[in-house]
């Protein structure tokens, strides 16, 4: 099933390779969840839901009653953003070897990546999807102002200790709001050691800048990003001026251990 409709596009395969490369590079620069969580799949466009946990009886049956075995399932969202490619500029590239501007494709890929990050960190509560920051059962520690070097270190150590005491021994990843992340590029007094390098020695699964409001420490085994369709670009048609394209993917966060996540609150 060619849901990307590429066979209908009036341009050669190497242009698709250029488009794909631009989209993947733009999205990859923003994606953090995939870098510290396991990634499973892609399993294909038809993956619309995944099951969580084990099958079990929904209630204990009476002696003369049939039992009902059931599991819980969550939906797999499809993310999509439209974009355009100028027919004239593509012709100029093919005929005259002028540079091919793929900024709209890159912008669309970035929009899809930002939405993926939102699903990973915040979920979609009205559709029963948990995120790392708001899943029921996650751990929390109190933090102080990250403008203070000691406060930042103390907060991360407290979060790691909470996870370790709960049986989650790492490796750990640390995801930070932009301001918190940028504050780590400071030297400890009388040393050449940047704080970010110090924290990377504690959070060996990586320290990442993400579009979130609170720091979070995540054990590697907290869950996985499950892919239906990985990021691709498809063809929707032409109006004679632009080729209508779209960037799409389908994914969901599967949280196996909510208690393997520790959020640092203000």
Name each region found by the language model:
Residues 50-99:
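Long, hydrophobic/aromatic-enriched structural stretches that serve as scaffold segments
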Residues 133-197:
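Extended, solvent-exposed, turn-rich assembly/linker loops in the middle of proteins
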Residues 40, 187-266:
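Sequence/fold signature of self-assembling virion shell proteins
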Residues 88-158:
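Alpha-helical scaffold segments that mediate packing/assembly in large oligomeric complexes
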Residues 126-130, 138, 179-183, 214, ...:
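Short, catalytically relevant binding-site loops at active-site mouths
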Residues 81, 170-172, 241-243:
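Structural beta-strand/beta-sheet cores of well-ordered domains, especially the beta-sheet scaffolds
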Residues 1-69, 228-244:
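N-terminal "assembly arms/tails" that initiate or stabilize quaternary assembly
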């Amino acid at each position: 099933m060619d849901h990307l409709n590429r066979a209908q596009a009036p341009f050669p395969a190497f242009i698709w390779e250029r488009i794909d490369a631009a989209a993947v590079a733009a999205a990859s620069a923003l994606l953090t969840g995939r870098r510290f969580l396991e990634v499973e799949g892609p399993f294909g466009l038809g993956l619309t839901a995944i099951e969580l946990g084990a099958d079990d009886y929904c209630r204990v049956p009476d002696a003369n009653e049939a039992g009902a075995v059931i599991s819980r399932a969550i939906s797999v969202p499809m993310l999509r953003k439209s974009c355009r490619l100028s027919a004239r500029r593509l012709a100029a590239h093919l005929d005259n070897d002028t540079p091919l501007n793929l900024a709209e494709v890159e912008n669309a890929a970035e929009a899809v990546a930002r939405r993926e990050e939102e699903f990973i960190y915040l979920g979609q509560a009205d559709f029963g999807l948990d995120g790392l920051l708001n899943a029921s059962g996650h751990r929390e520690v109190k933090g102080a102002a990250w403008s203070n070097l000691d406060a930042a270190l103390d907060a991360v150590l407290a979060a790691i200790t909470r996870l370790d005491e709960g049986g989650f021994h790492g490796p750990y990843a640390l995801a930070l709001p932009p301001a918190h992340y940028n504050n780590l590029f400071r030297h400890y007094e009388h040393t050449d050691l940047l704080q970010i390098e110090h924290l990377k020695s504690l959070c060996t699964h990586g320290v990442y800048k993400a579009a979130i409001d609170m720091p979070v420490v995540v054990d590697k085994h907290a869950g996985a990003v499950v892919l239906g369709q990985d990021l691709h670009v498809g063809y929707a048609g032409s109006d004679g001026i632009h080729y209508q394209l779209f960037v799409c993917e389908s994914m969901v966060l599967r949280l196996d251990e909510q208690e393997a996540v520790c959020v640092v609150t203000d």
